[in-house]
Amino acid sequence: MVSQRFRTVLAVAAALTVLSGCVRHGEPVPQQVHLAALDVGSHGSDPMTAPTTSNDKYGRVLESVRMGEVMLDPVEVDPTLTYGVQERTAPLPTPLTAAGILAERVREALESHGMLAGFAVSGSDVNLLGKRPEVGASRLLTVLLLRFPDDRSARLAARQMNATDAAISPDNVDVRIEGYPGAFAHWRPSVPTMAATYAHGSFVISALAAHTSPDQQVLTGTVRRVFDAQIPRLGDFRGTPPEDFDTLPLDRDGMQARLLPFGPGRWTYPTVVSSDVDTNAGWSAALSVYGVVLGPRATRLMKHYGFKDPIEIVAINDFDVLERFPDAVSARKVFELERQKVNPAELIDSPAGVPDVYCTKVRSDPASPHQAGCHVLYGRYTAALTGWSPANVQQRTAAQYALLVRSG
C-alpha cells in the first residue's frame, strides 16, 4: 500500500486500470518480465547481503526499534487520538534525537545520565495531512520511552528532565499525578499543554499532552492514563545489554536487502536524523528514519504512513518504504485498494515493462528531492519510492522491481 505520508506527498485519489496479467482466482502469479530490458539507469538491482559487522551507533538505533514493540498506542489513552503525527513516531537512539521532541535544554540531562535508547509515539484527534500541529487546535499526545543504564539513572533523569523543562518559563507550575507520587509534571495555567516524566525501573516515560483548552483535570487525567497503559507493557521487553548492541542484526528477514538502496552496492545503515530541534518542548521537530525494519507493533504505530492490515513488517529509508504481507493475495488486495484512490490528473508515465505499478506527480516545493513517486507490487511485497524527477523515479522503480524479482 501507499503510506498516508506517501499519499500526502504524492496527493493520490481515484482509479487506475490493472497493468499485469495475473491469475484472478487463487494465488496471484507475478508476470514474467525480461529484467535486462528494464531501464534502471545507474541504479543497481542485484540483491545485497547485510553486513555482518556493526557498531554501537547502529546498535542503539536497532535497540530503539525493538522498544517500539512495547510502546502504547495513543488510542489506549484517548480513543479520539486515531491519527498519527508526521515524523513524530520514531526510534530515538540518542539524546540528540530525543531532545528534538522534548527540548534542547533537556539533552544534557539525557547525556549525563547515560540514555541508551528510546522510542516516541504521537497521536492526534485531527488528520493533520502532513502539517505540523498547532497547540490548542486539537488534542495531541506524544509519549517517549527512554532506557537508561539502571534504575537510579532513570530516577535522576526523570527528575532533571522535568526540572530543566519547567525552568524554561517562570509561569510553569508543578502538578501532581494521582496514583503516581514519584512522577514529575508541570504546566502553564494559560497554555493547554502538560509535560510529565516518570521512572519505572531503568525506563523513563515522558508524556507531552495538549488539549483544546487549558483544562488541568483533563490533562492530568491524560498523563495518568499514559502511565497506566505504558507501565504494564514494559514487562514484555528484554533489553539487549549495552555491550551487545553491536551484535544486533542489521536486517530482518531480508527486508532491507529487498529495498532499493540510495546507491548501487551501498548498504543503508540504521540512522535517525532529527531536524528543527526546539528550544521548548512542542511539536515542531521532525525525525527521519533510514535503514530500519520495524516489527508488527511499531509498524502499526506509524499511523502517519497509513499502513493497512494485514501488513506484517516494513523496511524504511525515509520516504522509500517496502511492505511485506502474509501472502500475495493480501498484498494485491491492499495494492488495488490504494490505486483505486488515484486521481487520473496526478498520474505520470510508469516505467516501461514493469507490471503492477503506478506513478504520480508530487505536490512539493520545487527544491524538494521528492518530485514524483511510484508504487509497485511483486508477490507479497509492495514498495513506494520517490524521486527528484519522473525519469528518476521511473528508473528507481524499475530497479526496485528487478531487485524484488531477483530476491525471490
Q: Where are each of the predicted segments found?
A:
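N-terminal "mature-domain start" segment
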Residues: 23-133, 220, 226-227, 231-315, ...
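Bacterial N-terminal signal peptides that target proteins for export
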Residues: 1-10
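Hydrophobic, ordered structural segments
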Residues: 26, 146-149, 161-162, 195-249
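Short Gly/Thr-rich strand-loop-strand
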Residues: 92-113, 123, 137-140, 150-197, ...
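C-terminal motif of bacterial Sec signal peptides marking the signal peptidase cleavage site
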Residues: 18-21
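Short, intrinsically disordered low-complexity segments
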Residues: 40-42, 67-94, 183, 187-204, ...
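Long compositionally biased, domain-poor regions of proteins
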Residues: 193-199, 203-208, 212-213, 293-407
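A short acidic-to-branched-hydrophobic micro-motif
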Residues: 117-156, 302-337
